[in-house]
Each structure stands twice: as C-alpha cells, then as structure tokens.
C-alpha cells in the first residue's frame, strides 16, 4: 500500500523502543515487555547524559574539551527529548497513522495518485540516503579510535576506569557502541518520519488545490447544486487537513524545537574542532569524521525546515486556486461559500516551534546556520 511507505519501518522501530502505543487488544505480557524495552533505552540515555555531564565538569576550564563533549552531548539531549515526547504523547500520536489510512484522505483521480506516488518515492529516497549517511557518521565515530592506536574512546564521556587496561578499554568501547547505535537509529527514525508526515500533509494540500482548480462552470441550472456539494466537500476536506496538521505539529513541535537549539551547540563545537585540525598534523581522519557529522546535523534540521516550508507554500496557493475556478457564473449562494473559503484560506499554515513567532521554515534554517557561525566566530575571537 502506497500510504504505508510513509511511516511503516519507522513505526516498527518506535514499537521496538516501546514508545508507540500498542493496540487495544495487546496482552498484559506485551505491555510489560514494551515497558522493559522503553526502560532499557531510557536508562542508557540517562547514563550517557550523566557521564557527559561529569566529563564536562571535570574539564570546565578547557574550552576545547568542553566542545568535544558537546559534539555528542547535545545530540543525546535531543534524542532524550524525542524519546520522552513520543512516550508521553503516544496516545494522541497514534492517531497519525489512523488518519493517514483513513478513506477521507484517499485519492479521487489518477492525477492525485501520481502526486502521492511522487511524494512516496521522495520520502523513501530521503529516508534511505539520510539513514546511510547517519549510520556512516556513527560508524566513523566508532572506527576513528583504531587510527589513534586506541588511545581514546569513541565518545568524550567520563571514563569509569583507566583505558590503559585492555579489559577496561574494550568494556567501555562496547558500552559506547551500545549507547551510540540505538540513539543514532532513533534520530534517523524520528527525522525521516517527521519528513514523511510533512510530505503527506503537503500532498493533501496539493490535492485540494487541484480539486478547487477543477471546479467547473454552470451550464445547466442543476450544476449549481453539484458545485455547492463539491464546495462543501472541499471545505470539509480542508478541515480534516487542518486537524491532521495539528497532529503533525504535535509530533514535531517539542522535539524539533529542542533539536534546533541543540543543533546550534553541535554546529559551533564542530566548527571550532575543525578550525583546530590540520591534515599536515595527521588529523585527516578526524577532520573527515567531523565534516560528515556536520553535514548530517545540517541535513537533520534542513529536511524538517524544508518540508515545513513546502506545507506553507502549498497552503498559500489555496486562495489563488479557488479564485482560479470558474466562479463568475455561479449563483449567489455558491459565491458566498467561495468568499468564506477564501477568508479561511487567507492565512497559510505554519508549523511553529516553542516560540510562536518562530516557525519551521527555510528562513529558520538560514537563521540557525548564521547564528551558529556567529557564535563560532565570537568563540574563536575570545580564545585567540
């Protein structure tokens, strides 16, 4: 089924983590097992954040060491926000899948089917390419110690014992791997499903635009009744889209806002780290790791900002699309409905962050990048 490709594999992983609501018919042992899975990943994240915090306190006077901690600390904070948000809002968020599979969002023409298929292909390609690049970045983080004669651990967190001993080193290395990979996949899953939901919302708006533009002229008296019915269907369809948009915003708003704030910390720390490296000093592999991770972080915030911006663009076309229909020959009642719909369509859809005046958009993405570079330049000047 085409619609299932928008979310299928991501929901499976959410179920593995124990953050997605089980069906009402689930047995008690399934619910207990789900709670155990959620507790396991929550404890791992909590221990990671605790060890990162201790490492930061131990090196409070050394800027570069603190920024090395921020390299992953901020990312894990956003992971914790995503995990807790999904668990706390699981009952409401389960309605997303029900809404997407609802016949109310079904296609009515071959052209609409083509629109849905194009977005499905785009979603699958983005999920796969983003997943491959993210896993590649995580693998590099784990592999880099091999090029340093195992002189350091993959993540800059507190060492619970001396890494000079092989048993202690590999025990901590294994712990770092167990911590890093599930949270990496959580990021991939959440970000790709957020993009999928926004794309599905966008294609619903495109379908509504198409239906409004196809509203035809009045040739016979009974055509006014047919047009009145189609207008009411479009108005009801728009109301369903708005309700779906509210669910999507609930999914994205909290974790996405935390992600934007954490991204600034990660981008600044990566830029500062790269500015202190030199290929001549044998830092090529470390620079490659940081560059790829930087690209993943930029991609992570770009996909949500871009898809949200597309929703805003498509919703802003609604008013023009209904005006483009052949409304001049309709009766007064239908023209009144058109006027009411145009007033409703006048405000485009925005997916806001915690700050109501700051929405997810390409402008927001540009602001994040500019802000990160400004903080980096200031930090570099202060420490030069």
Swiss-Prot record:
Protein name (database record): Odorant receptor 46a, isoform B
GO biological process entries: detection of chemical stimulus involved in sensory perception of smell; sensory perception of smell; signal transduction
Tissue spec. comment: Isoform B is expressed in the antenna.
Localization per Swiss-Prot or TrEMBL: Cell membrane
Lineage: Eukaryota, Metazoa, Ecdysozoa, Arthropoda, Hexapoda
Topology, Cytoplasmic side: 1-37, 87-130, 187-247, 305-348
Any Gene Ontology CC annotation: plasma membrane
Miscellaneous comment text of the record: The atypical heteromeric and topological design of the odorant receptors appears to be an insect-specific solution for odor recognition, making the OR/Orco complex an attractive target for the development of highly selective insect repellents to disrupt olfactory-mediated host-seeking behaviors of insect disease vectors. Odor-evoked OR currents are independent of known G-protein-coupled second messenger pathways.
Membrane topology: Multi-pass membrane protein
Family statement: Belongs to the insect chemoreceptor superfamily. Heteromeric odorant receptor channel (TC 1.A.69) family. Or2a subfamily.
Oligomer and partners: Interacts with Orco. Complexes exist early in the endomembrane system in olfactory sensory neurons (OSNs), coupling these complexes to the conserved ciliary trafficking pathway.
Spans within the Extracellular topological domain: 59-65, 152-165, 269-283, 370-384
């Amino acid at each position: 089924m085409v619609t299932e490709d928008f979310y299928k594999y991501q929901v499976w992983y959410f179920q593995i983590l124990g953050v997605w609501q089980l069906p009402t018919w689930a047995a008690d042992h399934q619910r207990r097992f789900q709670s155990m899975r959620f507790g396991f990943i929550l404890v791992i994240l909590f221990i990671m954040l605790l060890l990162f915090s201790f490492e930061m306190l131990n090196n409070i006077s050394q800027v570069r060491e603190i920024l090395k901690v921020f390299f992953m600390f901020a990312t894990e904070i956003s992971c914790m926000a995503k995990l807790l948000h999904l668990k706390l809002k699981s009952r409401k968020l389960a309605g997303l899948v029900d809404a997407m599979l609802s016949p109310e969002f079904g296609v009515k023409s071959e052209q609409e089917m083509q629109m849905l298929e194009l977005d499905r292909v785009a979603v699958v390609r983005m999920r796969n390419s983003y997943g491959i690049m993210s896993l590649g970045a995580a693998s590099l983080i784990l592999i880099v110690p091999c090029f340093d004669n195992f002189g350091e651990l993959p993540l800059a967190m507190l060492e619970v014992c001396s890494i000079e001993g092989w048993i202690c080193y590999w025990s901590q290395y294994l712990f770092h791997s167990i911590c890093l990979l599930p949270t990496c996949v959580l990021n991939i899953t959440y970000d790709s499903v957020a993009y999928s939901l926004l794309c599905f919302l966008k294609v619903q708006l495109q379908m509504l635009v198409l239906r409004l533009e196809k509203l035809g002229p009045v040739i016979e008296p009974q055509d006014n009744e047919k047009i009145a019915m189609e207008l009411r269907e479009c108005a009801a369809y728009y109301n369903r889209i708005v309700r779906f948009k509210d669910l999507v915003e609930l999914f994205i708003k909290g974790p996405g806002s935390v992600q934007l704030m954490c991204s600034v910390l990660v981008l600044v720390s990566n830029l500062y780290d790269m500015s202190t490296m030199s290929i001549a000093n044998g830092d090529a592999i470390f620079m490659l790791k940081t560059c790829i991770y930087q690209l993943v972080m930029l991609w992570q915030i770009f996909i949500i900002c871009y898809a949200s911006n597309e929703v805003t663009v498509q919703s802003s076309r609604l008013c023009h699309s209904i005006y483009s229909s052949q409304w001049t020959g309709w009766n007064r009642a239908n023209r009144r409905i058109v006027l009411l719909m145009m007033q409703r369509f006048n405000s485009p859809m925005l997916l806001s962050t915690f700050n109501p005046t700051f929405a997810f958009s390409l402008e927001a993405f540009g602001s994040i990048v500019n802000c990160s570079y400004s903080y980096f330049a200031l930090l570099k000047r202060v420490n030069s």
